[in-house]
Amino acid sequence: MAKKSVRELIRLVSSEGTGHFYTTTKNKRNTPEKMEVKKFDPVARKHCIYKEAKIK
């Protein structure tokens, strides 16, 4: 039987308030704090900060 993965599925939500989000994985051991990544928001049509949120 396969071992449970250390990588956790997360959701990166736009700080612009457009409702756009990306899904990705992150290693819980190496980065226990919340991620903040600058990515392109196609709704706002500019680069902005995306913050980590749990996938429901």
UniProtKB/Swiss-Prot annotation:
Assigned protein family: Belongs to the bacterial ribosomal protein bL33 family.
- Which keywords does this Swiss-Prot/TrEMBL entry list? Ribonucleoprotein, Ribosomal protein
Annotated PROSITE patterns: RIBOSOMAL_L33
Q: What is this protein called?
A: Large ribosomal subunit protein bL33
- The UniProt record lists the keyword Amino-acid biosynthesis: no
- NCBIfam families reported for this sequence: PRK00595.1, rpmG_bact
Q: Where are the transmembrane segments?
A: none
Q: Quote the HAMAP family the UniProt record gives.
A: Ribosomal_bL33
Mention one GO biological process in which this protein takes part, according to its record. translation
Gene Ontology cellular component terms for the protein in this record: cytosolic large ribosomal subunit
Q: Which GO terms describe its molecular function?
A: structural constituent of ribosome
Which InterPro entries does the record cross-reference, listed alphabetically?
Ribosomal_bL33, Ribosomal_bL33_CS, Ribosomal_bL33_sf, Ribosomal_zn-bd
